């Protein structure tokens, strides 16, 4: 009854109006699952391959018909007859079918769409929520959200090198309250920007993208918004950055002029670490992502030695949700946290392996969206299923972001008294 009878993919659009895949999995019992695949703007060079058509006459070359065809003509044929509940076997079968180290033949987008749809079909067959199916009976931790309320770098036209400026309502008693705090700060920020005559249009991830005078102007404006909303920076609400520094790193230089023009500095790795430390000393920063370039291993190790006890240092482009890179980071003492993006690696099985490896090493795992998202809310379920404790899924606007928050509200409601919001305790990698 739980045997797969059909797998079908179609091309749909993501939140940027670019094509992506939607995959449906059908079973003998009528149980059904659907998965949609996100896409990034700033991508790590070691990520699994997102297969695009390259036909410039169609969607500017970004079409996904090749990946769709790979699902409908190759993957479907291989998976029909599998038990939908055997996630690991199905994921491993697709990896073997692809046969490349980076899923470059079939496309990580094709494989991931199927992987998500299979999990959803299994949960539907068992008539249990997705988070319960993926996580089992000990599923209870609601994630502390990192809310990207100012967009810079490759996610906006704002003249700021850092890609994301986030608020982290770690002092809230519940997820529901954390979300309320975030929304109130978001609206306070909008009002402040209007009063300053700055733009209130939002970027790819729902945050504002005004023309600030620089990084510190952005940070101080966020702190003002936190206080205006009635919360205490550094006690109730903390700050986070995604530097996305690989976007402005070139030949050993962190070149801020790429995004900031003449005002921008050019820093060596040592100067970059000094600058990050200055910001940490000055502001209530609890988490920083990709502060160093994805290939600057010496820089990462030096940064971690300097700040690893005080602030969460998250590897995104640095680790690309890949256990090979994470294992090296753990061994060499580089970073203390991994960002988890399902499409960086391409299957749920490999995603869960990365989260497990991080936890065993005392690293945190932050489940994350991509800048090109859909209404699919699977990452909300993954964050709870794994008790990851942290999620990064954008600002308090745009339905593609809110879909994940609303799903977490549902899950918290369903869990009832069992639900646990750990707040600051989710940052168990910090010693000070």
UniProtKB/Swiss-Prot annotation:
It catalyses: (2R)-2-phosphoglycerate = phosphoenolpyruvate + H2O. Its cofactor is Mg(2+). It comes from the Bacteria. Its EC number is 4.2.1.11. Coiled coil: none annotated. GO terms for biological process: glycolytic process. Keywords: Cytoplasm, Glycolysis, Lyase, Magnesium, Metal-binding, Phosphoprotein, Secreted, Virulence. One of its GO terms (molecular function) is magnesium ion binding. It is found in: Cytoplasm; Secreted; Cell surface. The active site is at 205 (proton donor), 341 (proton acceptor). Disulfide bonds: none annotated. Probably phosphorylated. Catalyzes the reversible conversion of 2-phosphoglycerate (2-PG) into phosphoenolpyruvate (PEP). It is essential for the degradation of carbohydrates via glycolysis. Belongs to the enolase family. This is Enolase. The lineage of its organism: Bacteria, Bacillati, Bacillota, Bacilli, Lactobacillales.
């Amino acid at each position: 009854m739980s045997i797969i009878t059909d797998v079908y993919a179609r091309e749909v659009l993501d939140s940027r109006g670019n094509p992506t895949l939607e995959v449906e999995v059908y079973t003998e019992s009528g149980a059904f699952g659907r998965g949609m695949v996100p896409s990034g703007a700033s991508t790590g060079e070691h990520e699994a391959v997102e297969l695009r058509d390259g036909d410039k006459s169609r969607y500017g070359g970004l079409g996904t018909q090749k990946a769709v065809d790979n699902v409908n003509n190759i993957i479907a044929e291989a998976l029909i007859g599998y038990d939908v509940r055997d996630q690991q076997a199905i994921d491993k079968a697709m990896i073997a079918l692809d046969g490349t180290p980076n899923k470059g033949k079939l496309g990580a987008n094709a494989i991931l769409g199927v992987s998500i749809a299979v999990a959803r079909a299994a949960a539907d067959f068992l008539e249990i929520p997705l988070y319960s199916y993926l996580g089992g009976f000990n599923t209870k931790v609601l994630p502390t959200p990192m809310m990207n309320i100012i967009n810079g770098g490759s996610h906006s036209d704002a003249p700021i090198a850092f890609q994301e400026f986030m608020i982290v309502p770690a002092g809230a008693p519940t997820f529901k309250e954390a979300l309320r705090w975030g929304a109130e700060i978001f609206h306070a920020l909008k009002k402040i920007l209007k009063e300053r005559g700055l733009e209130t249009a939002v970027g790819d991830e729902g945050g504002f993208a005004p023309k600030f005078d620089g990084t510190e102007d952005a940070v101080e404006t966020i702190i003002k918004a936190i206080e205006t909303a009635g919360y205490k920076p550094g006690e109730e609400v903390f700050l986070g950055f995604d530097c996305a520094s690989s976007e402005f790193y070139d030949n050993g230089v962190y070149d801020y002029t790429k995004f900031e023009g003449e005002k921008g500095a050019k820093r060596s790795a040592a100067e970059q670490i000094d600058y990050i430390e200055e910001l940490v000393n000055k502001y209530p920063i609890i988490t920083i992502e990709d502060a160093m370039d994805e290939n600057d291993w010496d820089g990462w190790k030096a940064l971690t030695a300097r700040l690893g006890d005080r602030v969460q240092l998250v590897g995104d482009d640095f680790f690309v949700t890949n256990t090979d890179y994470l294992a090296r980071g753990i061994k060499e003492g580089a970073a203390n946290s991994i960002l988890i993006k399902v499409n960086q690696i391409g299957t749920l099985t490999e995603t869960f392996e990365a989260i497990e490896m991080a936890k065993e090493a005392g690293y945190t795992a932050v489940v994350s969206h991509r800048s090109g998202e859909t209404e699919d809310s699977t990452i909300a379920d993954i964050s709870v299923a794994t008790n990851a404790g942290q999620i990064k899924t954008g600002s308090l606007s745009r339905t593609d972001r809110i879909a994940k928050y609303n799903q977490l509200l549902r899950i918290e409601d369903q869990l009832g008294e069992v639900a646990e919001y750990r707040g600051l305790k989710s940052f168990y990698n910090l010693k000070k």
